[in-house]
Amino acid sequence: MVGGSYAGIRAALTRYEYPETIFAAFSSSAPVEARINMTMYWDQVYRGMVANGWTNCTQDIRAALDYIDDQLSDEETASSIKQLFFGSGAEINSNGDFTSALTGIYGFFQSYGMSGGTGGLGSFCTYLEVDPETNGSTGPDGLAPLYGGQYVAERWAQWPVFTELVNENMDTNCRSLNESAPLDCDFSKPYGDPSAISWTWQYCTEWGFYQASNDGPHALLSRYQTLEYQQEVCNRQFPSAVVKGLLPPQPLADDVNKALGGWTIRPSNVYFSGGEFDPWRTLSILSTEDIAPQGVQFSTTIPGCGVETSENTVFGYIMENSEHCFDFQSTPTSGKLSRGLFTSAMLEWLPCFGQE
């Protein structure tokens, strides 16, 4: 059984729960640990940006957000800052919904890292980090120390593809970019896509994964992106479920881990992989976060067929400078290495097929 992301969770847990049915599994980028607070998602984005030479961009984003949050704290300026970014109609949004739309700059990161084409995070940082005096790249400290957070926020708002990117992500029509449709800049609308609805139900009821702001020196989000706001999104998506008592006050993450094992599972005949900067690795069996089990060694030594590794060992591989499910992309060398490890493991395990 092969899968990445949620399918990777299913691959690992299905082998764990039904070894008589599933002989082996490839579990890529799988956050098997349920947890409400997933603010560390953004720590991985920060690490990936810094590792790829964009420390200045992280600093400018924080400076811009400090200015934006300050403007949002006053009703007289809140409407203006919302309209600065998305035009007329944006002022109707709550501070939480508005700053949620600002996270659109990170939309392609987990799939492409600092790549992602014209709407990718690398393109945004390349656009942002231009000194207006020299028209050259900024230094390591970015723009804010010289020009201030307001300047950076205004430049962010002028990124040519930003409104289009947000419209696509939020199913809106801010600034009437689609001339054949009415103006629509309401970011509070519930999801309408069936796959988005089903996934939202899963994380709102069980898995958690609330990606609120990673407050502190590495913060990349507005302070209005709180855990409480994430819960509000769930309640808003399923209002009738709240009334009927079908939606719990918060996700039942502890119950999920108690039932399924979380990141302590060690099923035999399972290969785990993850990207170095994959935000979802923070809750995977290959997590290196402070909240994860400590002293666990990640080994590429193939265990024997049907042999579970010890609690302190995981058969797995972390792909260098990679993100989510990069072993299922054809180009990265690290992905090819990861697939090769699983192939080698299968060649070793297959002779005992049917003998377990």
Predicted regions and their residues:
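Short beta-strand immediately N-terminal to the catalytic nucleophile in serine-hydrolase-like folds
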Residues: 1-3, 28
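A short acidic (Asp/Glu
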Residues: 10-14, 37-38, 282-285
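Short glycine-enriched nucleophile-adjacent loop
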Residues: 6-19, 25, 32
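A catalytic-pocket lid/entrance helix-loop region that shapes and gates access to the active site
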Residues: 21-141, 145
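Short secondary-structure boundary/capping segments
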Residues: 16-19, 40-45, 286-292, 333
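His-enriched metal-coordination microenvironments in redox/metal-binding proteins
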Residues: 5-11, 280, 324
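Extracytoplasmic/secreted proteins, especially bacterial periplasmic and envelope-associated proteins
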Residues: 10-13, 56, 60-63, 76, ...
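C-terminal subdomain of alpha/beta-hydrolase-fold enzymes, centered on the catalytic histidine
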Residues: 103-356
